[in-house]
């Protein structure tokens, strides 16, 4: 790989560290009784409220409609996600250090696979929370209603408008993957180095013939 491509790959790998600092995803709830709104931030190893009491307020609302409480300690993915991201960082840096284009391609494929599996798992998590309701103890019961928030976008849930979008850490992951793709594409456009045959080499070739 060219020096420029390797620098891009190093930058892409180090950008993953931002996901340990910034939240990956955000879910916002807006309703007339909450003019400032409620928010939930999904981090690499935790789920927190946008404001100090937001997560507890969301859990109290969930109780009214029979949804389970959101307990970060019970979410297994939050325990393994830091190791997955750290592994991606290490693989990317190793590919840049060794400088093999196929390793950079493999890193991109592994990264994309992790992203797809992560989004699918997040959808499943949302589906379970929105459909697995305790209707016997729910105060508000709406037959046939589920409360699954959208994976990406906005959805009306009773009098709440739920919005689910990537947060700063999620965008950092997208930039990281994009930089890796650019590094491979730039390296693929390199022109092969033409070897100039010197006069002495021509003479040696003539002697051999």
Spans of model-derived segments:
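Alpha-helical transmembrane segments and their helix-start/interface "positive-inside/aromatic belt" motifs
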Residues: 1-17, 101-112
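Intrinsically disordered terminal tails
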Residues: 1-6, 22, 30-36, 185-209
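Hydrophobic membrane-targeting alpha-helices
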Residues: 20-23, 96, 119, 181-187
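A hydrophobic membrane-anchoring alpha-helix module
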Residues: 163-190
